[in-house]
Amino acid sequence: MNPKIGKNVNRQKLLEAMVYFSKKVKNPTKMMMYKLLAELDFRHFEETGMPVTNLEYVAWKRGPVPKGLHEEITEGEELILPKDFSDSLGCDKSEIETESGEKIRMFLFRHKRKPNLKVFSPRQQRILKEVAEIYKYATATEASKASHEPGKPWTKTIKKYGREGDVIDYIDQLTEKSPVSKQEATEMMEEAKAFLNNYQQ
């Protein structure tokens, strides 16, 4: 078995999700993409106890940010796509003017091919499509406001720690109504982590 099989599967799902969202959403900015990925992961986790991409999110000012991905694609004020993504995704610079007259530089993802949805389970495909439909015409600002709604992962984390910048704990997103208990989800995540660690040795 390939030592990196677990990471490769997560990486492939991340790429295909980004290709899909950039195709289906009108404003696939960097911050919007972060929001969409977070929605995909947290919604799937709430139903199954496992995220789709296995990204770790932190609670930043404007919403949840996948820290590892952000650090990988951000170089100063530029957005640089990794080699394994650049054949499938492009990125265009755009500039918008706010109501106050402030000019803001944005990056818009652009798909170069059709997404391969075969890497996702039927449940993952359903959630992927639901998230894209919800935010199809939303702006990054509207998506950011949605992140701040009561009960959302970002809001729970800020309330828990009283500050921005902390890691959003997937387990904290589960409620009594969730199909999976916190204990079950914790055990599944620990098993998945142990599996990856064993094959990385």
Whereabouts are the PLM-identified features?
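Domain-edge interaction signal
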Residues: M1-Q201
